Curated annotation (Swiss-Prot):
SUPFAM superfamilies registered for this protein in UniProt: Obg GTP-binding protein C-terminal domain, Obg GTP-binding protein N-terminal domain, P-loop containing nucleoside triphosphate hydrolases
Membrane topology listed for this record: Peripheral membrane protein
Summary of the knockout phenotype: Essential for growth, it cannot be disrupted.
Protein's UniProt name: GTPase Obg
Obg domain segment(s): 2-159
This protein's record includes keyword GTP-binding: yes
Annotated gene: obg
Induction: Expressed during vegetative growth it disappears during stationary phase and sporulation (at protein level).
């Protein structure tokens, strides 16, 4: 059964925003309580967060569909809906997030680094928030916005300081098992290692990690063997260690040709030219292996490599190797810029989102694109005439109608707001200039303009009293 997965496709859905509430305050002896509809809650985000305790993407291989909770709708009495709960998905350190086209969206390195893969929708405003001096009792509320839907790919690139590379059965797993406490599978046949193994090595005051990469063969960079699947795990390593088999039984192979083949594959893969290299001649406990190591060592040193003769089985030469690796790792760490865990947002919001465009398409349709118009359309309940009128007023104030006229739109032309796959299309009817004033104030409650009964009765009594007083003052006795 598969226990290690380093590449998955993930389908994430953020929560939808809750709808706003349209309600009027009702209380005894308060006939004009006014609007008191609360706002809807925000939908939950889907967040990828690096967790050091997670080492594989196996969970997302089995269940690739993940969804955050929706925001709750607002209620009367100025009660706002509850926000949806964010869905936090733990991922291994070194996870790369890509879109469907293969573009890198985020590179998550460092414990706690987070990435918002899908943003929750905003909650709709209740009618209490929409009330104004001109619109005193709105009979509508705004709808909550839908959450983001994203299809993303996750790739794990192991975060290690040292990578052991070499032919299958060169002794890489044996070497990492004696340098660290790792317990990889070890056997005397090729491709025993099917997944990268990580081990932690302590050399003096330096602690570093070593990755045992599955064996490489000629053509690995083009997908032969297992190389293409796991070469990306070498990308983050600071030091490359060539593990060469000095006791191979294959007559056409020798340490120098093995080194040339592996270097060719690394060069074809790309991006690894500046990594420092160390050559390890393994299996010197075998008599023929010791002799071969002494023969090829001068040639390797002439090429500029630091060479170490070791035996993972007999534990020979390991201390010198571990301290040499620690020195190179410390140098690489000192030269590396400090990385801080940051919360990455998939689409940063612009400070000014008031811009929009109007284009005329070949079929005569006018298309409006812009953050505000598209958001307003998503928030509108088209079953409510008052809400549609409110949308018309907002678009008019933004200048959409002016641009439509300049683009050549006429009464009855088709207008679409939004992208082709999710647009609202309607027949355009130009509004009257200052339409809100000419057509009446939408959402106005005329009871606010009428005199209140108690005040009217008080005025009537005062008028009767004044009239009686005047009659009394003008009374002349016989």
């Amino acid at each position: 059964m598969t226990t290690f997965v380093d590449r998955v496709e993930l389908h994430v859905a953020a929560g939808n925003g809750g709808h706003g509430c349209a309600s009027v305050h009702r209380e005894k002896f308060k006939p004009l309580g006014g609007p008191d509809g609360g706002n809807g809650g925000r939908g939950g985000d889907v967040i990828l967060t690096v967790d050091q305790s997670v080492t594989t993407l196996l969970d997302y291989h089995h269940s690739p569909h993940r969804k955050a909770t929706n925001g709750k709708p607002g209620e009367g009495g100025n009660r706002s809906g509850k926000d949806g709960q964010d869905l936090v998905l733990p991922v291994p350190d070194g996870t790369v997030v890509l879109d469907g086209a293969g573009n890198v969206l985020a590179d998550l390195v460092g414990h706690g680094t987070s990435y918002v893969a899908a943003q929750g929708g905003r909650g709709g405003l209740g009618n209490a928030a929409l009330a104004s001096a001109r619109r005193k009792a709105p009979g509508f509320a705004l709808l909550g916005e839908p959450g983001d839907l994203q299809d993303i790919h996750l790739e794990l690139k192991t975060v290690a300081d040292v990578a052991l590379v070499g032919y299958p059965s060169a002794g890489k797993s044996s070497l990492i098992s004696v340098l660290s406490a790792a317990k990889p599978k070890i056997a005397d046949y090729p491709f025993t290692t099917l997944v990268p193994n990580l081990g932690v090595v302590t050399a003096g005051e330096t602690v570093y990690t070593v990755a045992d990469v599955p064996g490489l063969i000629p053509g690995a960079s083009q997908g032969k063997g297992l190389g293409l699947e796991f070469l990306r795990h070498v990308e983050r390593c600071s030091v490359l260690v060539h593990v060469l088999d000095t006791a191979t039984l294959e007559s056409e192979r020798d340490p120098l040709s093995d080194l040339d083949v592996i270097e060719t594959e690394l060069r074809e893969y790309g991006g690894l030219d500046n990594r420092p290299r160390i050559v390890v001649l393994n299996k010197i406990d075998v008599p023929d292996g010791k002799d071969l190591a002494e023969m090829v060592r001068p040639d390797l040193e002439a090429r500029g490599y630091r060479v170490f003769e070791v035996s993972a089985v007999a534990h020979m030469g390991l201390r010198e190797l571990s301290f040499a690796l620690a020195e190179l790792v410390a140098t690489a760490r000192a030269a590396r810029p400090k990385e801080e865990a940051t919360r990455i947002v998939i689409r940063p919001k612009a400070v000014d989102d008031a811009g929009f465009t109007v284009t005329r398409e070949e079929d005569g349709l006018f298309r409006v694109r812009g953050e505000k118009p598209e958001r307003w359309v998503r928030q509108t309940d088209f079953n409510n005439d008052e809400a549609v009128g409110y949308l018309s007023d907002r678009l008019n104030r933004l200048g959409v109608e002016d641009k439509l006229m300049k683009a050549g739109a006429r009464n009855g032309d088709g207008v679409a707001i939004g992208p082709e796959d999710n647009a609202v299309v309607f027949d355009w009817e130009p509004s009257v200039t200052a339409g809100a004033e000419m057509l009446g104030r939408r959402g106005e409650d005329h009871r606010f303009e009428a005199p209140r009964p108690a005040a009217q009765r008080r005025r009537d009594r005062d008028a009767e009293r004044d009239e009686a007083q005047q009659e009394f003052d003008g009374f002349e006795p016989f």
